[in-house]
């Protein structure tokens, strides 16, 4: 009996422990949403979706606006460049039309001048000292040749020899005092230098213009003993600057002995800053002048002026090998030209 009672108590204790550890209470059933609440939830989700779409559209519109602004700026810049190019082309066209008109005017003037020149006789125009001689200017001295717009020559001061061998000579070079250095550069020989009444070089540009028609060259020399000699050439031409003022000579005549200028025939002009000679050495620097150096000289009429006592000790003096050799520097030299058809 006691065993049954104890067994019942044990089972009761086990039940109580199990109940306390895992109580079982009655639960309420879940509350269902009303139709209004379901509708509100659906609207919120749609609103959020619309807000997202609006944000995306705003971003797209912003990007499109920026791109449109950039495209507009680019279009404006292109329009401005086109307008600038159009103005530039218009300016160029205007300048071209102006130059064309000016050229037509110049051609008209030149044609008129040419027509007037054809009707003139040689006595009407003054080209050089021979023209002055034909106009009865018979006194040797300084004259001014008027400018010639048709030939492009400016007014030119020259020294005319109206006495020697019939007169009419235009002097292009003189050495007599030694007061002017002839060791000059290309530009100075091109333009001319010195004193027209003393030592001078007329200028290669001027000499070129004066020798464009058939011209005779005369070279007169004097030594320190007072002896006089001359050399003449039936045909003298000086090329233009593009041709390096190349020298061309015809037949020689005179009493100076051997022709010492023919060695320089068909030779370009050289100066200390422009070496056009036919030698490895720079002859203009060796001979201290500007001249038609070949390789190097048989004459050096633009060399250093040495006075008596020093005149026979140097190779860079004013020399004419055919008379006194290579180391004798002359006392006086003149180079002069006149037309071949000149008649006193």
UniProtKB/Swiss-Prot annotation:
Keywords, sorted A to Z: Coiled coil, Disulfide bond, Glycoprotein, Secreted, Signal
Fibrinogen C-terminal domain segment(s): 120-341
Protein task: Has a role in the formation and organization of the extracellular matrix. In the eye, it functions as a mediator of dexamethasone-induced matrix deposition in the trabecular meshwork, the tissue responsible for the outflow of the ocular aqueous humor and for the maintenance of intraocular pressure. Is a negative regulator of angiogenesis in the cornea, and plays a major role in maintaining corneal avascularity and transparency.
List of glycosylated residues: 56, 251, 265
Matches recorded under InterPro entries: FIB_ANG-like (IPR037579), Fibrinogen-like_C (IPR036056), Fibrinogen_a/b/g_C_1 (IPR014716), Fibrinogen_a/b/g_C_dom (IPR002181)
UniProt signal peptide: 1-26
Domain of life: Eukaryota
Subcellular location field: Secreted
A cellular component annotation (GO) from this entry: collagen-containing extracellular matrix
Key word Disulfide bond present: yes
A biological-process GO annotation: blood coagulation
GO-annotated molecular function: identical protein binding
Cysteines joined through disulfide linkages: 129-160, 283-296
Pfam family, one: Fibrinogen_C
NCBIfam families: GGGWT_bact
Coiled coil residues, start to end: 37-116
Quaternary structure and partners: Homotetramer; disulfide-linked.
Protein name from the UniProt record: Angiopoietin-related protein 7
CDD domains: FReD
């Amino acid at each position: 009996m006691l065993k049954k009672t104890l067994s019942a108590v044990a089972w009761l204790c086990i039940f109580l422990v199990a109940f306390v550890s895992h109580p079982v209470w009655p639960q309420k059933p879940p509350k269902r949403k009303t139709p209004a609440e379901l509708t509100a939830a659906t609207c919120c989700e749609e609103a959020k979706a619309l807000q997202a779409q609006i944000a995306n559209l705003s971003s797209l519109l912003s990007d499109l606006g920026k791109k449109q602004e950039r495209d507009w700026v680019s279009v404006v810049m292109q329009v401005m460049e086109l307008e600038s190019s159009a103005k530039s082309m218009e300016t160029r066209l205007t300048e071209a039309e102006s130059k064309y008109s000016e050229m037509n005017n110049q051609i008209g003037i030149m044609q008129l001048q040419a027509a007037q020149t054809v009707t003139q006789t040689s006595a009407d125009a003054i080209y050089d000292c021979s023209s002055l001689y034909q106009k009865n200017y018979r006194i040797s001295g300084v004259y001014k040749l008027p400018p010639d717009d048709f030939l492009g020559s400016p007014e030119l001061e020259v020294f005319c020899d109206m006495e020697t061998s019939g007169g009419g000579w235009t002097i292009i070079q003189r050495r007599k005092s030694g007061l002017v250095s002839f060791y000059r550069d290309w530009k100075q020989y091109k333009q001319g230098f010195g004193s027209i009444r003393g030592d001078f070089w007329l200028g290669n540009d001027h000499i070129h213009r004066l020798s464009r028609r058939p011209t005779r060259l005369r070279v007169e020399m004097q030594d320190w003993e007072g002896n006089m000699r001359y050399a003449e050439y039936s045909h003298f031409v000086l090329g233009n600057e593009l041709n390096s003022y190349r020298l061309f000579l015809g037949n020689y005549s005179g009493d100076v002995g051997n022709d010492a200028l023919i060695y320089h025939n068909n030779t370009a002009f050289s100066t200390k800053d422009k070496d056009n000679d036919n030698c490895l050495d720079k002859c203009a620097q060796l001979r201290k002048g500007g001249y038609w150096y070949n390789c190097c000289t048989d004459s050096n009429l633009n060399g250093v002026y040495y006075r008596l006592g020093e005149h026979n000790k140097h190779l860079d003096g004013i020399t004419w090998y055919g008379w006194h050799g290579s180391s004798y520097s002359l006392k006086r030299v003149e180079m002069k030209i006149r037309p071949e058809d000149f008649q006193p």
